[in-house]
């Protein structure tokens, strides 16, 4: 049969705060926005995305720390190919290229791949799935050193009622900081995550 086309819009604001400071200073905020084009056929799908990201340091953080501001922003074009051989397994991989950046000397290329396992699914009206996932990213700017993200948790997916989905996860990350101009620093984080999809 024929495949399916889908156009989507992505957006988000990701902020970090210094709760050790008297005024809970904003350290950094990343603003993301993009458009996605997806084509799905049988067990395969391909996603093409153009995304903009801009990062801004908090005013209090700049005043209280000797940090040189880098007005980091870029547009990236990426392509991901996904394969679902079974209902409980998905593997994906692809590449991205930065088409414009500030500063202009950022390396352009990146690779990404991962796997998702959903070994248990209820058949009730509100479908509940157990989820395990691994995502690996390699950026030329970081000399292709791996950034790894591991997740485990559950997904609530109301069957046949609406298109939303909620993920309740525990996430472990080991790699370069995803927070704006701190991308040269390696970090480790562990914490809960709640994600809502429409």
Where are each of the predicted segments found?
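Generic "edge-of-domain/loop-turn" microfeature
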Residues: 16, 44, 55, 100, ...
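Short C-terminal domain-edge/linker segments immediately following a structured domain
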Residues: 38-45, 79-80, 122-127, 161-168, ...
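Residue-level detector of the transmembrane beta-barrel scaffold of outer-membrane proteins
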Residues: 6-8, 45-47, 90-94, 129-133, ...
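Residues on the lipid-exposed face of transmembrane beta-strands in outer-membrane beta-barrel proteins
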Residues: 35-39, 79-83, 113-119, 150-156, ...
């Amino acid at each position: 049969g024929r495949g399916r086309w889908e156009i989507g819009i992505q957006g988000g604001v990701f902020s970090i705060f210094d709760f050790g400071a008297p005024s809970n200073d904003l350290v950094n905020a990343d603003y993301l926005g993009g458009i996605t084009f997806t084509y799905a056929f049988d067990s395969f799908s391909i996603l093409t995305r153009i995304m903009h990201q801009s990062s801004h340091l908090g005013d209090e953080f700049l005043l209280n720390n000797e940090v040189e501001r880098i007005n980091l922003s870029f547009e990236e074009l990426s392509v991901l190919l996904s394969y679902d051989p079974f209902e409980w397994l998905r593997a994906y991989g692809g590449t991205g290229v930065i088409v414009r950046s500030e500063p202009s000397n950022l390396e352009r290329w990146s690779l990404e791949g991962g796997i998702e396992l959903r070994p248990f699914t209820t058949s009730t009206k509100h479908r509940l799935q157990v989820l395990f996932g691994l995502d690996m990213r390699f950026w030329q700017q970081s000399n292709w050193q791996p950034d790894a993200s591991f997740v485990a948790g559950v997904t609530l997916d109301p069957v046949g009622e609406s298109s939303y989905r909620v993920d309740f996860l525990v996430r472990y990350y080991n790699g370069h900081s995803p927070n704006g101009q701190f991308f040269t620093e390696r970090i480790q984080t562990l914490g809960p995550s709640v994600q809502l999809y429409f």
